[in-house]
Swiss-Prot record:
Recorded family membership: Belongs to the heat shock protein 70 family.
One Pfam entry name: HSP70
Record-linked Gene3D superfamilies: 1.20.1270.10, 3.30.420.40, Actin, Chain A, domain 4, Substrate Binding Domain Of DNAk, Chain A, domain 1
Region described as Disordered: 496-515, 567-617
Gene designation: dnaK
InterPro entries: ATPase_NBD, Chaperone_DnaK, Heat_shock_70_CS, HSP70_C_sf, HSP70_peptide-bd_sf, Hsp_70_fam
Compositional bias ranges of the Low complexity kind: 579-604
Name this polypeptide is given: Chaperone protein DnaK
Amino acid sequence: MGRAVGIDLGTTNSVVSVLEGGEATVIANSEGARTTPSVVAFAKNGEVLVGQSAKNQAVTNVDRTISSVKRHIGNDSWNVEIDDKKYTAQEISARTLMKLKRDAESYLGEDVTDAVITVPAYFNDSQRQATKDAGQIAGLNVLRIVNEPTAAALAYGLEKGDKEQTILVFDLGGGTFDVSLLEIGDGVVEVRATSGDNKLGGDDWDQAIVDWLVEKFKNANGIDLTKDKMALQRLREAAEKAKIELSSSQQASINLPYITVDGDKNPLFLDETLSRTEFQRITQDLLDRTKKPFQAVLKDADVDINEIEHVVLVGGSTRMPAVTDLVKELTGGKEPNKGVNPDEVVAVGAALQAGVLRGEVKDVLLLDVTPLSLGIETKGGVMTKLIERNTTIPTKRSETFTTAEDNQPSVQIQVFQGEREMAQHNKLLGSFELGGIAPAPRGVPQIEVTFDIDANGIVHVTAKDKGTGKENTIKIQDGSGLSQDEIDQMIKDAEAHAEEDKKRREEQEVRNSAESTVYQTRKFVEDNKDKVSEDIQNKVEEAAKAVDEALKGEDIEAIKDAMEKLSAESQEMGKAIYESEAAQAGEAGGAEDAGSEDPNVVDAEVVDEDDSEDEKK
C-alpha cells in the first residue's frame, strides 16, 4: 500500500502535506516552494506546464494558460478548448493534483496512492463530486473530501490538547470564502455551523486593482487595455504583486513599460502608485460581503461572540490588513491567532485526516456538517425538507409520501437544495423517476424517499414503492455549481421573504387539504350510499361542489368556509349512519378506518413532472 497525503487544492495555490512520525509535514515542490500555483499551460510545442513554470509564461501564452479553474469545477457547461480538444475543469484540476502527487513521491521515495482533498465548506454536491473525480483522474484514491475550515480547525485544535474550546475559522482564499464555528475537545472536532460565498476571494481583490488601472490608463491615454489579452494578463500579474506588497507597505508602485501602443505605433507605459487607503476604498464592497456569512454562522450555531475562544485565519487573502481588522472588529476585539500559516494549515489538517482514516492517528473524530437544506418538491410546489442545513454528516433520513392521482403509474422525484419554502426558489440538483407503481387510488401507495449524505458531503437519494418493492436511486452529481448570487441569495431571500413564503405554503396546504377532503368524502359517500338518505347525500355533494368551486379561485378564506360547511354536512352524515341499525355499526367503523390516514405517511404528495408544472401555472 502506498502513502496517503493531504491536499489543499486551492483556487490560486495548492499545497500537499504528509504525516511523518505522527507529525504533518508540508512538502516542497520540485522548484523548492511550499505552495504550487494552481495554473496549467499548454505550450505550443505540446508540453504541459503546471505550477510556477506555467504561471511564468502566462503573458506570452495567454490563450493556452488556465488559472483559477476551481471557480468552474462542478459546472458541466464550462470547458476550455486547446488544439481542438475540450478540457473540463476536472481535467485541468487533475493536472495540478498530478504535479503535487509527483512532488510528494519524489520527496518520500515511494508511491502516493491515497489522498484527502479539501474543498470550501459551501461547495455543493456537484462541486464535491467533481473534485473527487479530479483526484481519480490524477491517479489518486480519494479517501475523503473534507471542508477547508474543518481541516484547519483539526490542524489547529490537535495542538491545543484535550481542553474544550470554541473556534471560529475565517477562511478567505483565492476564489472562495467560508466561515465556520467549531467545538474541539477530547479528540473530537465538531462543526456547529458554516456559511460562505463560493465566488469571493483574492482574485476579486486583484480584479478591483485591474479595473482601477484600466480606468486610470483609459482616462490618460484613451485606450481600453481590456481589449488586449496580453496587456490584461500583465495587469493581473501586476495587480497580484501590488496587493501582496500593500499588506506590508503603505503604497505600491505599478510600472509596466510598453504595455501597448498608440494610434501612431508609439509605445505607451503604465506607471501608477496605489496607496493602501485607495486599495481599501476600491475593495470595500468585497470586504462587506464577508459580514453576512459571519453573522449567519453565529445565529445558526446560537453562539455569542464572547463564547468564541480562538479565531483562526485561513487563506493567503487574510494577510490583508483590512481583512484582519474586520475580523477583529466582528469578534469584539479578539486578536486572530498568529500561530498558524494561513497558506498551509488546511493541507496539514487534510494530512491529519488522512492519518485518521489510515489508522495512523488515533482517538480523533471529525464531525462535519452539510451547508444547505435538502429536500424534494411535493404537491403545489412546496419544498419538503428532509435534511436541514448544518446537520452533522454522514446522515440519513427517510420520509414516506404518497401519490396525487388515482392509478398514478410513476412519480417524479425532484431534489432541491436551499432554504426557501417553495421549491422553485431553491436550486434544483437533479431529478429521477420511480415507475411501476401498482394501480391504486391516490393516497394509497406509499413511496419512501431516503436522503443519504456520505462523509464527503455527496448526496444519494432513493425512492422506493413499499407496495411493489421497486426502487430507484440518484447520486447528485449532474447539476452545475451554485453561482455567487444563487448562494448569497438563498439565505438572504429565505429571511427577506420568510413571511411571504410561509403564507404561500399555508395557502397551498389549505388547498391540498381541501382537495383531499373532497376526494375522501365522495369516496365515503359512494361506499355507504345504502346507509344514508338521498337527501343527506345531496347536501354533502352540494357542499363538496362548493369546495370545488372555491378551489378555482384565489380566496383562501372562501376555501376554508366551504371546507367548514362540508365538514358540518359530513358530521350529519356520520351521525345518520351511527343512528342506523346496529348491524351496520361495524361497517360504519370500517368506513371510518378507510377515511383515516397512516400516521407514518407525511401529508404531502409527490406529483408527476407534468402535473407539477400545471400546479405552478
